[in-house]
Amino acid sequence: MMTEFGSAMTLVTGLVAYGAYVKSKRQSNHYLLKTNNNFDVEKENFNYNNNNNNNNNNNNNNSNNNDNNNNNNSNSNNNNNNNNNNNNNNNNNINDKQINGTNIFDSNNQIKRRLFD
Protein backbone atom coordinates (compact mmCIF):
# COMPACT_ATOMS: atom_id res chain seq x y z
CA MET A 1 0.00 0.00 0.00
CA MET A 2 2.73 2.42 0.96
CA THR A 3 4.67 1.49 -2.13
CA GLU A 4 1.72 2.26 -4.36
CA PHE A 5 1.09 5.53 -2.54
CA GLY A 6 4.78 6.45 -2.81
CA SER A 7 4.88 5.74 -6.52
CA ALA A 8 1.64 7.72 -7.02
CA MET A 9 3.14 10.69 -5.16
CA THR A 10 6.28 10.42 -7.24
CA LEU A 11 4.13 10.46 -10.34
CA VAL A 12 2.17 13.52 -9.12
CA THR A 13 5.39 15.32 -8.18
CA GLY A 14 6.81 14.49 -11.59
CA LEU A 15 3.71 15.82 -13.33
CA VAL A 16 3.70 19.02 -11.26
CA ALA A 17 7.38 19.53 -11.98
CA TYR A 18 6.84 18.88 -15.67
CA GLY A 19 3.85 21.31 -15.72
CA ALA A 20 5.97 24.00 -14.08
CA TYR A 21 8.72 23.39 -16.62
CA VAL A 22 6.28 23.67 -19.55
CA LYS A 23 4.74 26.84 -18.10
CA SER A 24 8.13 28.50 -17.63
CA LYS A 25 9.13 27.48 -21.14
CA ARG A 26 5.96 29.03 -22.54
CA GLN A 27 6.57 32.26 -20.66
CA SER A 28 10.15 32.49 -21.88
CA ASN A 29 9.01 31.84 -25.46
CA HIS A 30 6.33 34.50 -25.08
CA TYR A 31 8.97 36.92 -23.81
CA LEU A 32 11.21 36.08 -26.76
CA LEU A 33 8.35 36.67 -29.17
CA LYS A 34 7.60 40.02 -27.56
CA THR A 35 11.23 41.16 -27.70
CA ASN A 36 11.54 40.01 -31.31
CA ASN A 37 8.44 41.98 -32.24
CA ASN A 38 9.78 45.05 -30.48
CA PHE A 39 13.07 44.65 -32.29
CA ASP A 40 11.26 44.54 -35.63
CA VAL A 41 9.30 47.67 -34.75
CA GLU A 42 12.49 49.47 -33.72
CA LYS A 43 14.15 48.35 -36.92
CA GLU A 44 11.25 49.66 -39.01
CA ASN A 45 11.34 52.98 -37.16
CA PHE A 46 15.07 53.21 -37.74
CA ASN A 47 14.64 52.55 -41.46
CA TYR A 48 11.77 55.02 -41.62
CA ASN A 49 13.85 57.71 -39.93
CA ASN A 50 16.77 56.99 -42.24
CA ASN A 51 14.50 57.31 -45.27
CA ASN A 52 13.19 60.62 -43.94
CA ASN A 53 16.73 61.87 -43.44
CA ASN A 54 17.64 60.79 -46.96
CA ASN A 55 14.57 62.55 -48.34
CA ASN A 56 15.44 65.70 -46.42
CA ASN A 57 19.00 65.55 -47.72
CA ASN A 58 17.71 65.08 -51.26
CA ASN A 59 15.34 68.02 -50.85
CA ASN A 60 18.19 70.17 -49.53
CA ASN A 61 20.39 69.10 -52.42
CA ASN A 62 17.61 69.88 -54.88
CA SER A 63 17.07 73.33 -53.39
CA ASN A 64 20.83 73.92 -53.48
CA ASN A 65 20.86 72.84 -57.11
CA ASN A 66 17.99 75.21 -57.82
CA ASP A 67 19.89 78.02 -56.13
CA ASN A 68 22.96 77.19 -58.19
CA ASN A 69 20.88 77.06 -61.36
CA ASN A 70 19.38 80.44 -60.52
CA ASN A 71 22.85 81.83 -59.92
CA ASN A 72 24.08 80.35 -63.18
CA ASN A 73 21.12 81.82 -65.01
CA SER A 74 21.70 85.25 -63.53
CA ASN A 75 25.40 84.98 -64.35
CA SER A 76 24.65 84.02 -67.94
CA ASN A 77 22.14 86.88 -68.14
CA ASN A 78 24.81 89.24 -66.87
CA ASN A 79 27.25 87.86 -69.42
CA ASN A 80 24.69 88.34 -72.17
CA ASN A 81 24.08 91.90 -71.03
CA ASN A 82 27.82 92.56 -70.97
CA ASN A 83 28.19 91.06 -74.44
CA ASN A 84 25.32 93.18 -75.70
CA ASN A 85 26.88 96.28 -74.18
CA ASN A 86 30.23 95.42 -75.74
CA ASN A 87 28.60 94.87 -79.12
CA ASN A 88 26.79 98.18 -78.83
CA ASN A 89 30.04 99.92 -77.92
CA ASN A 90 31.82 98.30 -80.86
CA ASN A 91 29.03 99.32 -83.18
CA ASN A 92 29.19 102.87 -81.87
CA ASN A 93 32.94 102.94 -82.45
CA ILE A 94 32.56 101.63 -85.98
CA ASN A 95 29.70 104.01 -86.73
CA ASP A 96 31.87 106.94 -85.66
CA LYS A 97 34.46 106.01 -88.30
CA GLN A 98 32.58 106.46 -91.52
CA ILE A 99 33.15 108.40 -94.67
CA ASN A 100 29.96 109.54 -96.33
CA GLY A 101 27.98 106.88 -94.40
CA THR A 102 30.32 104.04 -95.43
CA ASN A 103 32.22 102.17 -92.73
CA ILE A 104 35.96 102.41 -93.20
CA PHE A 105 36.42 99.33 -90.99
CA ASP A 106 35.37 95.77 -91.81
CA SER A 107 33.78 93.37 -89.33
CA ASN A 108 37.20 92.53 -87.82
CA ASN A 109 37.81 96.21 -87.10
CA GLN A 110 40.43 96.30 -89.87
CA ILE A 111 40.55 99.26 -92.23
CA LYS A 112 38.96 98.31 -95.55
CA ARG A 113 41.43 98.38 -98.45
CA ARG A 114 38.83 99.44 -100.97
CA LEU A 115 36.21 101.78 -99.63
CA PHE A 116 34.14 102.21 -102.75
CA ASP A 117 33.64 99.06 -104.80
From Swiss-Prot:
Disulfide topology: none
A cellular component annotation (GO) from this entry: extracellular region
Biased composition (Polar residues): 96-110
Superkingdom as given in the UniProt entry: Eukaryota
Glycosylation, residue list: 61, 72
Region described as Disordered: 42-117
Cell location: Secreted
Keywords, sorted A to Z: Glycoprotein, Secreted, Signal
Composition-biased stretches (Low complexity): 46-95
Signal peptide limits: 1-24
Name by which UniProt lists this protein: Putative uncharacterized protein DDB_G0287599
Native source species: Dictyostelium discoideum (Social amoeba)
Higher taxonomy: Eukaryota, Amoebozoa, Evosea, Eumycetozoa, Dictyostelia
